[in-house]
Amino acid sequence: MTNEDTFSTIDHAINLETGKTIRVWETFPKDNSLVKNNTILIASGFARRMDHFAGLAEYLSSNGFHVIRYDSLHHVGLSSGNINEFSMTIGKKSLLTVIEWLKRRNINKFGLIAASLSARIAYDVANEIDLSFLVTAVGVVNLRDTLERALKYDYLQLPIEELPEDLDFEGHNLGSEIFVTDCFKHQWDTFNSTKNKMKDLNIPFIAFTANDDSWVKQNEVLELIESLNPEKCQLYSLIGSSHDLGENLVVLRNFYQSVTKAAIALDKGSLNLDINIIEPKFEDITSVTVKERRLKHNIESLELA
């Protein structure tokens, strides 16, 4: 655990009965901020580690939020396991484990922010857990279609025995048999399965699409939103952004600003993003990012020792 006085990110380890560990990072609200009602739990997108969301955590904590991030099991990052054994169900179990850990610490009021592939997991559990609100960014609603667009081929049409050993997804080897088998077994693959999981949603929900997103069909996200309670959900677009929310500093800042505004609005029961926020200094974000990378390397070094 790091010194809270000199570094705002606190490292925790959830040790499981299986011998595996889920790593969690915690950031408290800034001292001069108006503390909000809810904690924010961030679920990173596929092939993204929790330290990739240092900037978002800095924005949220500067605006009064207590922020929790984690790395999924069998994923990139600090938690146990290799990404070639990742499945959507493992991602779901990792999220639920972190939520149970929060509840054991008497943190019962929280909103969930999920990006990309993790948003599909969020859609799966939103009706199963006691969330205050949900925010998704470039959230996957049709997993099979997104995989085909990302991989340039519909591998889910192949019999299991004809699949390649690994699927190269964003430079990482995803174990095809494990991932595809899980998709079909637990019905992660279709747009209708997402709609069915979300159909009774009764919490405030804001979704962000990106107008240049080639991996997610905006019309399907709109269809999902239109199937829900119109008084509790709203769709916004991140203009000028692709599926990669970190492709440049302009896009990244827009993402940070928009999601922070959504969290503040939802925390006070609104869907309106016409909100003033406190923007952390660029050098503060850079400093936290560097310190978190150093923390990550120190943890990895200790695990290898």
From Swiss-Prot:
**Primary enzyme class:** transferase
Q: Which residues form a coiled coil?
A: none
| Superkingdom of source | Bacteria
Q: Does the keyword Transferase apply?
A: yes
Indicate the family of this protein: Belongs to the LuxD family.
Which NCBIfam families does this chain map to? PRK13604.1
Q: What is the designated name of this protein?
A: Acyl transferase
Q: Which organism is it from?
A: Shewanella woodyi (strain ATCC 51908 / MS32)
Upper lineage: Bacteria, Pseudomonadati, Pseudomonadota, Gammaproteobacteria, Alteromonadales
Q: Its gene?
A: luxD
